[in-house]
Structures are given as C-alpha cells and as structure tokens.
C-alpha cells in the first residue's frame, strides 16, 4: 500500500533567497508527500554536509542542482519499491548508498528531503496527520514557543553579539494564548525600539535587529516590552538566549570576545558573565553558551548553572547521537536542540530525541535561519514530545507557517491536548 513508486526533486528558494531542495515521494495509494529542506546561517562544524554546487556564476555558488540530481539519479532508483512506512529501512538504505560519515557524497539535503517526504506520504496514505503517524497515540503535548524577537550575531547586521534573544511564554494556559502573548510582546517591542530611535528592520528569523549598546540593553528593552504588553516577567513570560558562542570564540587564543561590548573572557569569565545575566533577568534557557569544541567550559557552565537553567547544546551536539552520548557521559548541558538537517534523516533525528529523553535531557525542536513554508517541524515537535519549539519571531510567513500549524494541531487535539508550559523546563518543575 505504501510502496514508493516515484521520487522527484527540484530546486526552490528559501526565506533568504538561497536555493534549497524540495522532494516529492509518491506511494502506491496515489498519495504524495512533499518536503523542503531548511538551511542554517551559523552552522556547526560537525553537521552533516549540505551539498551546494559551488558555481559562483549561479546563485553565488549556492545552487543545489547537484543535490537535486542525486535525488533523481542516485537515490530514487535505490528506494523505489521500498515501503515508505518502514522509515528506518528507507533511511538506512540512503545512508548506506552515501557511505560517508557526513553524507557528503549525496548531500544531507538530498537524503533528508527524501526521508521527510516519504514520511509525509506514508502518513497521508494511512489517513493520519504527520504528528500522529510519527508520534503515535500519545502525541498530544503542544510545545512552548521560544520566540526570537531580537536578533544579533550572525542573524543580524548589528553590534549585539548574542545571536538570539527569545521570549518564552511559559505561564499561559494554551499554545494559542502563548502565541498571542509572544506576538503582543513583539509588537510592543517595536514601539519601545522606535521610542529609542532604534531600527525596527527584522533579521533572518523575523526578530528586530537594532544596533544597541550591549547585550544587556537588548535584555532591558525586551523586559520593557513585556511590561508594556501587560505580561508579568518571570511568572507568565521568561527569557532565553542563543549565544552562538562559536561565532565569537577565538580558538587560537582560547578567548571569547564580545566585540560589541569590548569584553574578552576566558571560559571561567564567560560563565560568570552568564551567571550575572541570569541573576538579573528571568532567563530560563541558554543555548550554545560555549564553543562547540570547548567541552571544559561547557562543564564549568553546567556545574555552575545546570541546576537552575536549561543549557542547550546545538552546535555542540548537532543532533548527533555520538556527540550527545559524549555530553551525557561527561555531564555536559541538560538539553539538546533538534534540527533535522544537522543529521540528515528522520530516523537519526528520532534516535537523538530518544537518547536525550532517556538521559533526562529536555529537547527543543528547531528551525534554521533559511526556512520555507514547510511545516514539518511543527508536527515533529508534537510527535517527539519535545515540549519546546524554536521557529522564529511573530513575523515572516516562513516562521508563522509553523505556528499556524501548531494552532491547527491544538484545535484538532481538543480536550486531549495539553500545553507544556513550565513543565517543559526541567529546572522549573
């Protein structure tokens, strides 16, 4: 019934105007699944390889014709005839066909497109929404949105070093109310920034990207916006940071340099800097607080703040079970960011989530800075019982599409659904 009968692919554009891969998989029932692959701006060194053409005369070298050709000429002949409902076998076939540790032969973007499209085709063939097909009957938890309303670092052209400042509406009763809260704070922040004469253009993920004096000023204006929107900081709304510390780490010197503030820290100093921010503001989560290979400072940070805050490994773990296992063994961080394109297949993504949950780590489903209208991660957040999702601000349709899908899922679940709220954060339980 769900035998794969056709696989095709094309080059489309993502939210930054860069090419990406879109795949369609057709199964014997006549159902078709379609998936578009996202792309990151600040990417971890240990991520699976996103295959680009490298032809500078076309899309500045960022074309994906090679990956598209690999889907059509290499992957399709190998998977036609397989059962799309057997996700593990399908993904294993593609991984074996590639034969490299980072999927560099066929491209993680090629493999992932087929992996996700096949899952969507199978779900439709079985008459199930994707979250129910992947997550089973127990998939009913709506995630807390970590809404990136102010951008810095690699996501914006400004002197704010920390990459993302997020509002976390954890004290609301439903996902719909949490989303409304985040949107109202987003609009209030625009007024606050305008009042200070700051720019209100938005970055890659829909958050404002003003040039502010310091990271702390960014936190201060968000706190002001929360109050102006009529919400209570700490009780109804908390804050989260994605520091993307690998972007401001000097590997040769072993120092972290916040150029916008003129500050330079060793690992111990950086941990103290975060501790001071957490003491002053209602921060519940810090992502990528240290460099992706600075395990020693990660250990210091976990020992200092791991009992109070969620410490999320993104570039550190890259949704990879080998790196995650090392983190668990060393007692580093207490949470993992989940990005399907970091590892390049649905099966491996689900394995990482299961490993994290077994170890008592929280999981945060995440978008990338280069997105499309594809809403797969909204369903996966519910399917995987992540409890949290990062999918940008309350602007840009590529971000809003995911939030709207979660609104639909909440409506469909009705009384059986629950909003994760504060319970999504282990330190707050």
Swiss-Prot record:
Main subcellular location: cytoplasm
Binding site for (2R)-2-phosphoglycerate: 163, 339, 368-369, 390
UniProt-annotated location(s): Cytoplasm; Secreted; Cell surface
Active-site residues (renumbered): 205 (proton donor), 339 (proton acceptor)
GO terms (BP aspect): glycolytic process
Role this protein plays: Catalyzes the reversible conversion of 2-phosphoglycerate (2-PG) into phosphoenolpyruvate (PEP). It is essential for the degradation of carbohydrates via glycolysis.
UniProt name for this protein: Enolase
Natural source organism: Anaeromyxobacter dehalogenans (strain 2CP-1 / ATCC BAA-258)
Lineage of origin: Bacteria, Pseudomonadati, Myxococcota, Myxococcia, Myxococcales
């Amino acid at each position: 019934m769900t035998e794969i009968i056709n696989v095709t692919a094309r080059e489309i554009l993502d939210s930054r105007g860069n090419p990406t891969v879109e795949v369609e998989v057709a199964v014997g029932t006549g159902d078709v699944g379609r998936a578009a692959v996202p792309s990151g701006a600040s990417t971890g060194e240990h991520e699976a390889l996103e295959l680009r053409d490298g032809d500078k005369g076309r899309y500045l070298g960022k074309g994906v014709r090679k990956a598209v050709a690999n889907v059509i000429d290499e992957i399709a002949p190998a998977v036609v005839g397989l059962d799309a409902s057997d996700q593990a076998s399908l993904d294993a076939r593609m991984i074996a066909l590639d034969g490299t540790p980072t999927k560099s032969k066929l491209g993680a973007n090629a493999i992932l497109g087929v992996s996700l499209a096949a899952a969507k085709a199978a779900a439709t063939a079985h008459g199930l929404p994707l979250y129910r097909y992947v997550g089973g009957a127990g998939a009913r938890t709506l995630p807390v949105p970590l809404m990136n309303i102010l951008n810095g670092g690699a996501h914006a052209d400004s002197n704010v070093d920390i990459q993302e400042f997020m509002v976390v509406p954890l004290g609301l009763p439903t996902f719909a109310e949490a989303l409304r809260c985040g949107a109202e704070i987003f609009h209030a922040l625009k007024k606050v920034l305008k009042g200070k004469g700051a720019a209100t253009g938005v970055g890659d993920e829909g958050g404002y990207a003003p040039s502010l004096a310091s990271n702390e000023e960014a936190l201060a204006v968000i706190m002001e916006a929360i109050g102006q929107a009529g919400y209570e900081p700490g009780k109804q709304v908390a804050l989260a940071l994605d520091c993307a510390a690998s972007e401001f780490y000097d590997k040769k010197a072993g120092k972290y340099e916040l150029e916008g503030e003129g500050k330079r820290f060793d690992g111990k100093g950086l941990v103290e800097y975060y501790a001071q921010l957490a003491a002053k503001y209602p921060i519940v989560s810090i992502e990528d607080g240290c460099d992706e290979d600075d395990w020693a400072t990660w250990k210091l940070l976990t020992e200092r703040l791991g009992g109070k805050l969620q410490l999320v490994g993104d570039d550190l773990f890259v949704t990879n079970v080998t790196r995650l296992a090392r983190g668990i063994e060393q007692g580093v961080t207490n949470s993992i960011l989940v990005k399907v394109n970091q590892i390049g297949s649905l099966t491996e993504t689900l394995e990482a989530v299961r490993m994290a949950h077994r170890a008592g780590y929280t999981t945060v489903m995440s978008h990338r800075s280069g997105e499309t209208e594809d809403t797969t991660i909204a369903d996966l957040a519910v399917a995987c019982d992540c409890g949290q999702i990062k999918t940008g601000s309350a602007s840009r349709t590529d971000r809003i599409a995911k939030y709207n899908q979660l609104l639909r899922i909440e409506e469909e679940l009705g009384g059986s659904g629950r909003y994760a709220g504060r319970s999504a954060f282990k330190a707050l339980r």
